[in-house]
Structures are given as C-alpha cells and as structure tokens.
C-alpha cells in the first residue's frame, strides 16, 4: 500500500515541501533563516491575535489598553514583549536572509527574489503600522513624520496624505485604519510566503558553491528538519533572553509617554530596523529626493539580478566581491547608527558619505568587481 502522505491531496503538498523535498547536501546555517522567518511570522500572528483581544484602537484608550495588557492580563506583559521584540528578531532574520541571497547569488531565481522583495515591503509596512498602535509619543510623531513624506509627491501629495490620515492630522481615524491594516497584513504575508516557497520549489534551493547540485540531493527530513529545529530553539533562546532580561532594550523611552500632538520629542526616529533607510532619507536635503532615495534604497534589490556580471553565481570563490559585500554590511551598520543620531555635524556628512557608498557599491563597484574577477580567471 502506498504511503498516505504521498497520496492524500493535502498531505502530498506538505510531503513535497517539508519531507521528501530533494535538498542540496551542502547548504549552510545561512539557509536556516527562511524557516526562522516562518517561525517568527507564526509567533507574531499568535501573539498579535492575543494582544488584539485586549487592545482598543481608539486615541483616548489605546495607550491605557496597552498598560492594561501589561498589568492586568495574565502574562500580558510576556505576550506584549514577545510581540515587540519578536518584530526585532524577525527583521534580524530578514536582513540575514536577504544578505545570504545577495552573497550566494540566490537573486538569480527571479520569481522567488521578486516575491521576496514584495514580502520585504509588506513586512516593513506592517511593522511601521504596528509601531503606531501603542499611541505613545514616538508612535504619534513617527506616524506623522513618515506619512507626511508622501506630501512630497507632486500635485496629489497633500490630498494623498490627508486621505491616508482620514482627516487633517494623525488622529482617531488614522489609528483605527492602521490597526485594521496591521491585523490583516500578516495573513497576506503568510499567503505571499507560500507563493515564495512555491516558486522556490520550482527551481530547488541554491547552495553555497553556486553550482548545480542535482547530482547530490538529500531528503529534507530528517536532515534539515532537525537543523531547522535547532535554529528555532536558538531563536527562542535569544528572544526569551531579550524579553525576560531587557524587554525595552530595542524600544524608545519616549513611547512610554502618551501621545501629545502639542509636544514634539527632541529626536524623532523609527525603530532600529528602519534607521538605515531613515539615514538615507535624511542625507538628502530635498524632500522629494530624500523620499525617492528611501524607496530606491530597498527597490535597488529588484535590479540586482540585472547587474550580475560574474560568470560564477555566488561569492564563495570571489575575494574582490566578498570584500565589497562586507564593506556594504559595515556601511549599513554605519547608516543604522547615523539614523539614530541628531541631525548635526559630524553626523550629517557621515550619513551622506555612507549613503553615497551604499548606492556606489551596489550599482557600480559590484558589477565592476564581477568583470575584473572574470578577467583574472581568463573566462
């Protein structure tokens, strides 16, 4: 008798995705982040669901309802901090996952890569709207500043911003719609992630060497299921440490002050995972130019496949490109630091130089390095 997991219509899908999936035998720990992102997403949906049961999306009670969750709901503080810090862990995994894709040439699977970029934008939008919900000072002013950027769009900008706000400022209507979107988007992300996997399984996984691995495939289970479980346990340990020892480490103290439209915080800044993009935005004195640079800083990922000049797929055997890649990582860390600093000398010029370097590495230096490496190998 044939095994039910290979014949049942539903079980067959699961079997072909997580059990009998032929997987390259040499994929490293950098390939763990895909499954970790799945774990993070499920965790965020579950904790978010329980938070939504006690949260009220109203300007007068939102801040109090979050306080109520932390003080009065059984283990409410755990749920709240797992959700808040879970977002940070989510973004760490995201950056690692995208970095892996850049390093090993995974962007040469165009459908998977493009769905990934859409996922990245959707997750960033979801995280931004989630940050507004506690209705603290940084929630309110962050929402005001970031939504206001849309007013830089010629002709329709102002109308567009007021349409998004649902009034003439960030107010009750804005909070209500942000809650609605923040609730629905994770389920859209879940569907997109399924499509992302669907396209990945059309081609099979890439591997560190960048050469076809059809001759050496192993079943996903038990080899990679156990590896993914280990990754998930390490993720859980990291998150638990963060939640139980320093839950506010990555947050902003200003968000413990209820939102006040009459008092602007001294330094308005988003969550740490947006600081690199915020630094790029601030490094351009012109409003529209800054907004375009901000969007392009992420959208640039979409043209990476077109800029691939090397005859090798990954960077495993390309020392020049490796140096540029790690320079890019250092540059992004610098931008993250600058994004959290006030707009004054010397931070302005450092931010501008780091922004120029970011685009130069991706658009100019990496393609040139690929050509040089081809010539060095006489290819």
Swiss-Prot record:
Transmembrane segments: 33-53, 77-98, 113-133, 178-198, 226-246, 288-308, 320-340, 347-367
Domain of life of the native organism: Eukaryota
Cofactor annotation remark: Binds 2 heme b groups non-covalently.
InterPro entries in UniProt: Cyt_b/b6_C, Cyt_b/b6_C_sf, Cyt_b/b6_N, Cytb/b6-like_sf, Cytochrome_b, Cytochrome_b_C_euk/bac, Cytochrome_b_N_euk/bac, Di-haem_cyt_TM
Keyword Metal-binding: yes
Record-stated family: Belongs to the cytochrome b family.
The protein's name in its UniProt record: Cytochrome b
Gene that this sequence comes from: MT-CYB
């Amino acid at each position: 008798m044939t095994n039910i997991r290979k014949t049942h219509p539903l079980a067959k899908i699961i079997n072909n995705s997580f059990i009998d999936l032929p997987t390259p035998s040499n994929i490293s720990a950098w390939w763990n982040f895909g499954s970790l992102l799945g774990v993070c997403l499920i965790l965020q949906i579950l904790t978010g669901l329980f938070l939504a049961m006690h949260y009220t999306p109203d300007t007068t009670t939102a801040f109090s309802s979050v306080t109520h969750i932390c003080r009065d709901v059984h283990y409410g503080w755990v749920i709240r901090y797992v959700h808040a810090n879970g977002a940070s862990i989510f973004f760490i995994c995201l950056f690692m996952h995208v970095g892996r894709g850049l390093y090993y040439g995974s962007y040469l699977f165009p459908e998977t890569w493009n769905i990934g970029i859409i996922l990245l934008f959707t997750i960033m939008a979801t995280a931004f709207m989630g940050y507004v919900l506690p209705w603290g000072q940084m929630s309110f002013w962050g929402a005001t500043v970031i939504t206001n950027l849309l007013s830089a769009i010629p002709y329709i900008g102002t109308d567009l911003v007021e349409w998004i706000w649902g009034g003439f400022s960030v107010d009750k209507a804005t909070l209500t719609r942000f809650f609605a979107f923040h609730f629905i988007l994770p389920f859209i992300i879940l569907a997109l992630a399924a499509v992302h996997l669907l396209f990945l399984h059309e081609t099979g996984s890439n591997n560190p060497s960048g050469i076809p691995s059809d001759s050496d495939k192993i079943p996903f289970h038990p080899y990679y299921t156990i590896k993914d479980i280990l990754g998930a346990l390490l993720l859980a340990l990291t998150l638990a440490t963060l939640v139980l020892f320093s839950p506010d480490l990555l947050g902003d103290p200003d968000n413990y002050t209820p939102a006040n439209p009459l008092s602007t915080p001294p330094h308005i800044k988003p969550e740490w995972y947006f600081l690199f993009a915020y630094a790029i935005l601030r490094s351009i004195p012109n409003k529209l130019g800054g907004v375009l640079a901000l969007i392009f800083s992420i959208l640039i990922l979409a043209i990476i496949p077109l800029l691939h000049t090397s005859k090798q797929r990954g960077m495993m055997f390309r020392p020049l490109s490796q140096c540029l890649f790690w320079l890019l990582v250092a540059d992004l860390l610098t931008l993250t630091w600058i994004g959290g600093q006030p707009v004054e000398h010397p931070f302005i010029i450092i931010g501008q130089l780091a922004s120029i370097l970011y685009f130069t590495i991706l658009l100019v230096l990496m393609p040139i390095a690929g050509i040089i490496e081809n010539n060095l190998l006489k290819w």
